[in-house]
Amino acid sequence: MLRGMARLENLLGVQALAVVDRMTGNDLAPSESAALVTLLAHPGSGIGWLADVLGLTDSGGTRVVERLVAAGLLARRPGSDARSRVLELTDQGRTRAEAALSTRERELAQALEPLSDSERQTLERLLDKIVARLADDRPSALHACRMCDREACAAGAGRCPLEHTVPPGGLP
């Protein structure tokens, strides 16, 4: 591998970890913060679905949910049938998810601050290409975007580089 490429990869990795570290805070694991942010965008989801999005086993997803329920950030509610349960953020959980997204926005804005408008536009175009290759189906796109501000890539604000993973006609 070219030495310059290794340095670029290292710099991207350092920046990504710094943002995630600051988003999660001291009392939540990254998977717990990701669960809150994901459920903010997808309320009423089940544990199995959440585990898939987070890239966890079913038992790993259950442990994350148990910790969030114990912390008062998440509640289980009856699902559409007698056996199913859905997950809902509590008011405190919603506040924590929104705080994580605000921290993410602030940290990324600070990271981009030294760049000129032209450099930011160039970086956005380059990252569009990189991010578009992260997923080729909906489950992997949801995993890639588990800490995303969903409104930032909404129709009026731009286009999600992973929109190609949405089935024709939209999501069910």
Please tell me what each predicted stretch does.
Residues 1-26:
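N-terminal leader segment of winged-helix/HTH proteins
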Residues 4, 31-32, 92, 119:
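N-terminal positioning helix adjacent to the helix-turn-helix/winged-helix DNA-binding module
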Residues 4-7, 11, 99, 122, ...:
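Charged, amphipathic alpha-helical oligomerization/scaffolding segments
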Residues 17-60, 71, 141, 160:
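N-terminal helix-turn-helix DNA-binding core of bacterial DNA-binding proteins
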Residues 66-121:
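Charged, amphipathic alpha-helical coiled-coil/dimerization segments
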